[in-house]
Amino acid sequence: MIRAALALAALVAFRGAFAAEGGLELLVARYADAAAAEQDVSRAAALRASMKADGSWGDIDYSDKSRSEWPVGAHVRARLRILAADWRRNGSRESLEAAHRALGFWLKHRFNNPNWWWNIIGVPMSLGDAGVMMDGELTDAERRGIIELMTVEEPGHAKTGQNFAWMSENRLRRGMLARDEALVRSALKDVLREVRMGEREGIRSDWCFHQHGEQPQFGNYGLSFLVSQSRLAALLAGTGFEYPPEKLELVRRLASEGYSWICWKGMMDVSAMGRQLHRDTQRTKAANVERAFENLEKTGWVRPAPRFGFRYFDKSAYAVYRAQGFMASVRASTPRITGTETWINEDNAKGMCMADGALMTYATGREYENVFPLWDDWRMIPGVTAYLGKPVVRKDSRNRRDDIRAGSAGDGGAFEFTFEREGLVAHKKWTFSPDGIACEGSGISASDGAYEVVTCVEHALAAPNAGVVERKDGVSRFRNGAFVYTVHAPKDAVSFELAEREGNFNTFMLAHEPTPVKGRVFSLRILHGKSPADAAYRYEITPAK
């Protein structure tokens, strides 16, 4: 979704261009060049070689109905656009001929997906890009077919936030193909409509971005929004058609006050990513944040110095602490603020506990890189107190309590809240300082006696130095990478494991191919027993000396 927004970089100061430099035709040409520049045309020859005579590819199952990563969508989203780009950039007649066949196959069959996003945003976006790149070579029938597929009914629930911005960009593409100047002007105006403070969705007053209600979406819809708006702002800077100052300031502050906190050493915080737990997604999302920052710098924005200290996002039940050698985050939810999305378009099918007091801790940034398939129990999220082994379920994952207290003090800060769901109650508190994190829990009780209650101290990739520092009754110390974990509990109440595990992304991201993933995991837990009453815990996570 983020990549699709990058085509917006072709926009120019269109009013001035229309009047002085050839009008709409110039806009179409510049847009086509920018869209072509985004594609990896080195793949074009292989795509031509593997294409069947009817314009299809044998390795795509055209009956597939996966809602998230839809393999059929790759026909237009990747392959058709690559062929069209090879024609636009390199003048390859072979790729142009193949693009005509690929386009014809799609227009003949008009594949649909049960997820409205593909039909109304994703496919029209890709067809529009390909059509503009092939513009001078399109037949009248091809042009009509693309425009018809792009003229789709927009569901009312989609007309907010980044969904609305995507649809506005599609109207821009349609206007260029139809040579409809009024539609182009209207679409560009609509792109800016969502650059505003939102009461429930969009840019919130804590400088997080929400979508699907009061739900933090830093890494999904919010990142698409930041990328597309920053690129457009950069392109229009200095043209006489700049962003209105108040709109540009909102985009800049979203970057400065929000996104500048959530990445560490080229990796996005797991708790900021949202439901899209794809392979390498921490790295790719952080790279897109960096690209957005570079675009904003072209508008005169001054990138803030590296952030240090405690930052509480009060509309998002989320906090970040950054010190010289490490970063940590806490993610919670309330009856009002939704936790991490689950089961949306086959994404994050096991993530119901990811906002139950998750504590993610980073020194290298790679502590949780692609660890998700190796989690043997998705209730054992770092920092979370939960039922051990109880199956995760597909239902509302919100906390039943709304008592978060958080704030900074000097060079540190604190976050505490009460978690309650499924008969389990736990009061949890974290105190952050440059010396580390003090973690406390109290009042832990549970009504479901079928499962043991456990607090997960850590569930990360095992570093080469992972192991026991000392273990005795009352206090045990463990090390993993740059951190030492000191647990204050009886020895038999502390569970520690270094384990080689194997898993699959497709067990929680259902559209992933079933490719085995192997790795070594560091797992540390505090055991509270079954049906605890007023149980407690205490541990510290400190930088290793």
Residues of each region from the PLM?
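Aromatic-lined, polymer-binding surfaces characteristic
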Residues: 29, 45-280
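Intrinsically disordered, low-complexity regulatory segments of eukaryotic
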Residues: 35, 178, 539
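Extended polysaccharide-engagement surfaces of secreted carbohydrate-active enzymes
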Residues: 232-545
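Amphipathic repeat-derived elements
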Residues: 39-42, 146-164, 300-303, 333, ...
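Boundary at the C-terminal end of the N-terminal hydrophobic targeting segment
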Residues: 17-19
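N-terminal alpha-helical scaffolding segments that mark the starts
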Residues: 23-48
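N-terminal export leaders
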Residues: 1-3
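Bacterial N-terminal signal peptides
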Residues: 5-15
